């Protein structure tokens, strides 16, 4: 079974995107990372930083997660991210996404030993 840490990497890590600037980026990535297998995942964020930099966030500013848990952390610096949001004309299995690039601080939930990101909570 895929570990929570490996699932985070599959769903959210893209350190050196070849085509993040393309409007088709989300359509391609959501499909290739299996985020449209049994439904169209409505919203997903990809982070274009090294895995080490994202894992380091687990030791940065401790914040409360959206669900009320206390194991979320906010990055000290803004990171290059791409937000993928399902567009109105999207219908499974033909999932269609809008691609939006941004520079924002990320908030991730961390757990385990080693202590690593397992959930992308928000960007601010």
From Swiss-Prot:
GO BP annotations listed: defense response to Gram-positive bacterium
Name the record gives this protein: Ribonuclease pancreatic
Sugar attachment sites: 34
PROSITE patterns linked to this entry: RNASE_PANCREATIC (PS00127)
Protein EC: 4.6.1.18
GO cellular component, one term: extracellular region
Localization per Swiss-Prot or TrEMBL: Secreted
Upper lineage: Eukaryota, Metazoa, Chordata, Craniata, Vertebrata
UniProt-listed CDD domains: RNase_A_canonical
Active-site residues annotated for this sequence: 12 (proton acceptor), 119 (proton donor)
Tissue and organ distribution: Pancreas.
Keywords for the protein's UniProt record, in alphabetical order: Disulfide bond, Endonuclease, Glycoprotein, Hydrolase, Lyase, Nuclease, Secreted
Alphabetized GO MF terms: lyase activity; nucleic acid binding; ribonuclease A activity
Encoding gene per record: RNASE1
Source organism of this protein record: Capreolus capreolus
Functional description taken from the UniProt entry: Endonuclease that catalyzes the cleavage of RNA on the 3' side of pyrimidine nucleotides. Acts on single-stranded and double-stranded RNA.
Comp. bias regions, Basic and acidic residues: 1-13
Region (Disordered): 1-25
């Amino acid at each position: 079974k895929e570990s929570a840490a490996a699932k985070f990497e599959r769903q959210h890590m893209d350190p050196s995107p070849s085509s993040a600037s393309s409007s088709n980026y989300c359509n391609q990535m959501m499909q290739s990372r299996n985020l449209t297998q049994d439904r169209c995942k409505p919203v997903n964020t990809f982070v274009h930083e090294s895995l080490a930099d994202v894992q380091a966030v687990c030791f940065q500013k401790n914040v409360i997660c959206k669900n009320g848990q206390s194991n979320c952390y906010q990055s000290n610096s803004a990171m290059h991210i791409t937000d993928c949001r399902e567009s109105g004309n999207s219908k499974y299995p033909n999932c269609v996404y809008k691609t939006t690039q941004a520079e924002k601080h990320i908030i991730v939930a961390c757990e385990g030993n080693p202590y690593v990101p397992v959930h992308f909570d928000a960007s601010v």
